[in-house]
């Protein structure tokens, strides 16, 4: 019987990936469609992906699939063909290719079955997730940005918006997608007569959000096809002005893709212009925050003097201090302090 999960340590896997000579391509994709048996589908896809040396993070649920992966460049076309023939619903599926890619985005394949491919918190049996808003392509996005009757809504989390967003886009201040949905409805009541344009990283969140807005009585709703990644790629290919400002946060080891030269965020320690996220080097903290090179040197990669001091302690003492401590990494929010999260790099499904 084939092994359908990883048995090698993260350190060993990462070292193996870093030693690879063949370049890799980072790809993301999603599809809302009915999967009758998510576990069986997961196990079958796991065998397909491992045979092609695919790394990454894949979620499956009855409502569909959500994936961020890394594929050896020589196997990208084979991967595409096998994905398209795996299920008729996946035939011709758009694959978002990373805008900036060092090939080191993932080093292990993790595939999980979940209740939802995006945790939306929706518990309304009358909600029709297929009744989505209209798609906007790159040229349409730019036209909408110049339309005074249009309102752009960023359906990403606060730490994503902080480092990059579309011109004049509204932020829905929240730490997770499930918190954003009811807030978006509330905040946009005063714009009910406007054209609502929703966007996110790759399209999966804004697609469901557009259906939620329509469910709540908003009639003029659009969302950007393929999200920021597809927009920036197509705008560049077509010689259009790229109207996204700053960096696009991504949920892998890269933590960001440069879209424009502007740096709109600031170091969380000294306030200098900076948009590079990192995790606190103290294993008992792992706070996700923005740190400039000067502060990284000053604090040895830590978020505070306290963590810097703890990192300098003998490993045994560090482990003792971590024991019993709330185990969960955190995300820095300037308005609310430290927020709990389960991953060093936040979970894209949240």
Curated annotation (Swiss-Prot):
Any one GO MF term held by the record is: oxidoreductase activity, acting on paired donors, with incorporation or reduction of molecular oxygen
Top-rank EC class of the record's enzyme: oxidoreductase
Q: Which residue positions are annotated as catalytic?
A: 200 (cysteine persulfide intermediate)
Q: Which reaction does it catalyse?
A: uridine(34) in tRNA + AH2 + O2 = 5-hydroxyuridine(34) in tRNA + A + H2O
Q: Where is the composition biased (Basic and acidic residues)?
A: 319-328
- Region Disordered: what ranges? 319-350
Is Membrane one of the keywords? Answer: no
Which BP terms from GO are recorded? tRNA modification
Q: Which Gene3D superfamilies match?
A: 3.30.70.100, Rhodanese-like domain
Q: What is its EC number?
A: 1.14.-.-
Which parts of the sequence belong to the Rhodanese domain? 146-240
For this UniProt record, the keywords arranged alphabetically read as follows: Oxidoreductase, tRNA processing
Among Pfam families, the record links this protein to: Rhodanese, Rhodanese_C, UPF0176_N
**Entry's InterPro entries?**
Rhodanese-like_dom, Rhodanese-like_dom_sf, Rhodanese_C, TrhO, TRHO_N
Identify the PROSITE patterns for this entry: RHODANESE_3
Its family remark reads: Belongs to the TrhO family.
Function of the molecule = Catalyzes oxygen-dependent 5-hydroxyuridine (ho5U) modification at position 34 in tRNAs.
Protein's name according to its UniProt entry: tRNA uridine(34) hydroxylase
Q: Which organism is it from?
A: Salmonella gallinarum (strain 287/91 / NCTC 13346)
Q: Provide the gene name from the record.
A: trhO
